[in-house]
């Protein structure tokens, strides 16, 4: 491994030898504060006496989340009233709890998911013209996974700005995520400085730290990027971001999955862990056997806790937002598969050897100090672990983070599920994420205290054969025990959005088209006049306690059109190859679409996708740079 590292390091330094980057300014540390207050490293604090270190999941919502949702409801209610009135619909008798869930898939998922969010923002002219803009103001929860967690972190930390504004003024995603166009030496020097400071304190440092810092330096606010002070913690967001401090945005949840000792392939029933600005934990522990989970204050994550009490030394700063985003997106197990298509044999051999060593050393996961050590040892399967080992939750095939929004305690009424998964040969979704969550829900239902409320959905073949993976579909329409899931799959309304998960850079015009196409997957490109009304009906249906017997005529007509009817054609479908700049055939067959010509915005076709040999070579170069930097640090 040292030979590989040396070769990578020399090649990296050779590319920067003729350009001496300017010194990166570092903020002077205040004398009374530890290093971690100003940098990526955690810092030591006095242990507080008024903290509940472990909260059993069966006790309901934590106090921080409960207070946030109560404050959020006061803003959500008038927003929903306004949106319903605009459609000529009745105001719900109670405020519905609405969630959005953004799938994983690297930058593709980040851009497509944020495009979908943009379709719900009244700040977007096109979304407002499409009459879906404004609904984000009625959303209470937002969950993100992998690339969807990048979308979550960037959107929340930047105060809910329009994604196209972030692209224009902040993001530097035209520079390779881990192999920047310039300043490579300063980039890796800063990585070394920040991660070494964390390591010196005795905390584990792995590839996730580097990956997360790289992500943060492309999408987080500039003051918290690697070249400045990368010290934005998840727990500090409500105090740092005014729009979160006053509950003007949905409460963010970022999701990861546990990889148990000895596992190479993550079980679909693996423990799902969630990070919020208030807590870290899981609603259900274990994979083979499920038991009620628990939560700990995320502000003190990294503190050694034994049976609910700290061991004398407490820490803050472990919950760096970049680290949480990196934890949710540990894509490197999948790098083995992607390398099979890399053009350079030498490159493939070098990176494969390095990644193999990482896998053996458990450096390809994220290690979280176990706050639940010796807690509830009779039922807690992680009571004897020093670290909780987390990976990208998409590795469980639950690539849409629905589970946190299906927990009965949160009382979610409707979920808008944005799916940009790489399920098919041509990198389009086929419903795998929803079906996997449905199958997992059956396992969780075996224990009353771990169940989630997931409606039935068709098989993957049924999704494709029914066309459900090409247009919005409502699931759980007449099952009043579950939320209504409004499934929004990515579709090439105006752009070839089926780019590779491992495409590590996007030109700004390409990223802009990705955002617009994601928005049009939700708005249907303003081509279906009844869609805004039907979208409103689905979002609020549960708060009326409607069924097919008492729904309004307007909303029942919508549900007759958009609800899954229970069919499941399990025969092997033909390859799914949607046409760019087209209307989904189902919309045409059902006489719902007025055609693309009447839709606002540019619908110019873009040829090709980013899964070409050149893109794969870019993947390889990014991995070279990343592994080179890691080798210098570990």
Curated annotation (Swiss-Prot):
Cited SUPFAM superfamilies: FabD/lysophospholipase-like
PLA2c domain location: 46-569
Enzyme class: hydrolase
Domain of life according to the entry: Eukaryota
The entry's keywords: Glycoprotein, Hydrolase, Lipid degradation, Lipid metabolism, Secreted, Signal
A GO MF term: lysophospholipase activity
Cited Pfam families: PLA2_B
Post-translational modification (record): N-glycosylated.
GO CC terms of this entry: cytosol; extracellular region
Residues bearing attached sugar chains per UniProt: 50, 56, 122, 231, 246, 269, 311, 340, 384, 430, 478, 498, 525, 550, 569, 591, 603
Reactions catalysed, as given in the entry: a 1-acyl-sn-glycero-3-phosphocholine + H2O = sn-glycerol 3-phosphocholine + a fatty acid + H(+)
Signal peptide, first to last residue: 1-19
Gene Ontology biological process terms, A to Z: glycerophospholipid catabolic process
Entry-linked PANTHER family: CYTOSOLIC PHOSPHOLIPASE A2 (PTHR10728), LYSOPHOSPHOLIPASE 1-RELATED (PTHR10728:SF33)
Purpose of the protein: Exhibits phospholipase B (PLB), lysophospholipase (LPL) and lysophospholipase/transacylase (LPTA) activities.
Family according to the record: Belongs to the lysophospholipase family.
The name this protein goes by in its record: Phospholipase B
Source organism per UniProt: Cryptococcus neoformans var. neoformans serotype D (strain JEC21 / ATCC MYA-565)
Source species taxonomy: Eukaryota, Fungi, Dikarya, Basidiomycota, Agaricomycotina
